[in-house]
């Protein structure tokens, strides 16, 4: 299959490397300087150092060239750049099937990635979303992982899952696009909280409690938005949440640890140097929770630290001092 990967960040590059073993892959970046580096070094030194780009991967900076032979397009750009990227694709080809590899809510609209697709395309288009517990570095190294590919089109989800599934990267199909996307978005917010907990040396018990209660509020919002409750017990729910809250490669967890150390957000983002979606997702999640009257205490704590200048210790204390309730509430 001819697959074009749009976005040469860490995850886009890792997917391109993985897929190139069985497919014809084109990797696109709009940054011509970055493209020149990739072509010269055959390594993505900016975002995925140490991982060789196979010679079979074609590199492109012109979107028309990248899409010319494509049978499937993986869109792996930050959510902030998704709409404009989709508009450029749609202007060239309205019929190419898409699989989205980005996680979050669009700022200002609070729309999920597949909802942005619906906004952009004038006609119905086949679209899926790829999500689950997957650090780019490990996928590029060929270490085992498992993902979910969700689409409203069951046949498409099963077919594409089968195309990209191997014994190293197992891919399961789903029809719950909303549930898969909500899980992928909100786990980044909970991971910031987990990083704060770890940074304050609260211990393993506290981290486990945060993950569990975090899953509860992810599920509450996800179901309210139309997701299926059982989805949140799967790879794109609890699976991705556990990895992002515990793994040392988690950028969102790193944000939390640096907040606990007293660093300010601009300094943190500059040092990490990669997009950390949880920082932006928390604003939309907080507002949706408020509008829908959904109890989201972990999200509220992270939001208050990042955007209301509440000291870390005060925000955590406010969360811990909440009145007890039934676990299933």
Curated annotation (Swiss-Prot):
Pfam families: NAD_Gly3P_dh_C (PF07479), NAD_Gly3P_dh_N (PF01210). One of its GO terms (molecular function) is glycerol-3-phosphate dehydrogenase [NAD(P)+] activity. SUPFAM superfamilies: 6-phosphogluconate dehydrogenase C-terminal domain-like, NAD(P)-binding Rossmann-fold domains. The active site is at residue 187. Sn-glycerol 3-phosphate binds at residues 103, 132, 134, 187, 240, 250-252. Gene3D superfamilies: N-(1-d-carboxylethyl)-l-norvaline Dehydrogenase, domain 2 (1.10.1040.10), NAD(P)-binding Rossmann-like Domain (3.40.50.720). One of its GO terms (biological process) is glycerol-3-phosphate biosynthetic process. Belongs to the NAD-dependent glycerol-3-phosphate dehydrogenase family. This is Glycerol-3-phosphate dehydrogenase [NAD(P)+].
């Amino acid at each position: 299959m001819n697959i074009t990967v749009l976005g040469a960040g860490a995850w886009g590059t890792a997917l391109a490397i993985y897929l190139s073993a069985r497919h014809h892959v084109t990797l696109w970046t709009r940054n011509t300087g970055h493209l020149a580096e990739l072509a010269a070094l055959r390594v993505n030194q900016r975002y995925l150092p140490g991982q060789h780009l196979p010679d079979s991967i074609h590199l492109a900076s012109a979107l028309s060239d990248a899409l010319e032979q494509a049978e499937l397009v993986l869109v792996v750009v930050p959510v902030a750049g998704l709409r404009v990227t989709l508009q450029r694709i749609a202007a060239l080809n309205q019929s190419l099937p898409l699989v989205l590899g980005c996680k979050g809510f669009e700022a200002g609209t609070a729309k999920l990635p597949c909802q942005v697709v619906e906004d952009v395309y004038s006609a119905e288009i086949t679209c899926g979303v790829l999500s689950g517990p997957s650090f780019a570095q490990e996928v590029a190294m060929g270490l085992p992982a498992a993902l979910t590919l969700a689409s409203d089109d069951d046949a498409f989800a099963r077919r594409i899952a089968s195309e990209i599934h191997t014994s190293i990267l197992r891919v399961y199909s789903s029809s719950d696009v909303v549930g898969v996307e909500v899980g992928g978005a909100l786990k980044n917010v909970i991971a910031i909280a987990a990083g704060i907990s770890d940074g304050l040396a609260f211990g393993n018990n506290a981290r486990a409690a945060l993950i569990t209660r975090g899953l509860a509020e992810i599920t509450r919002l996800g179901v309210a938005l139309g997701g299926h409750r059982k989805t949140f017990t799967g790879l794109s729910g609890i699976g991705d949440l556990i990895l992002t809250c515990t793994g040392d490669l988690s950028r969102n967890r790193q944000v939390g640890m640096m907040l606990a150390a007293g660093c300010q957000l601009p300094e943190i983002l500059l040092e990490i140097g990669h997009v950390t979606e949880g920082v932006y997702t928390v604003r939309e999640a907080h507002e949706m929770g408020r509008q829908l009257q959904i109890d989201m205490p972990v999200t509220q704590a992270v939001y208050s630290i990042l955007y209301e200048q509440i000291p870390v210790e005060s925000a955590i204390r406010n969360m811990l001092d909440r009145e007890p309730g039934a676990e299933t509430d």
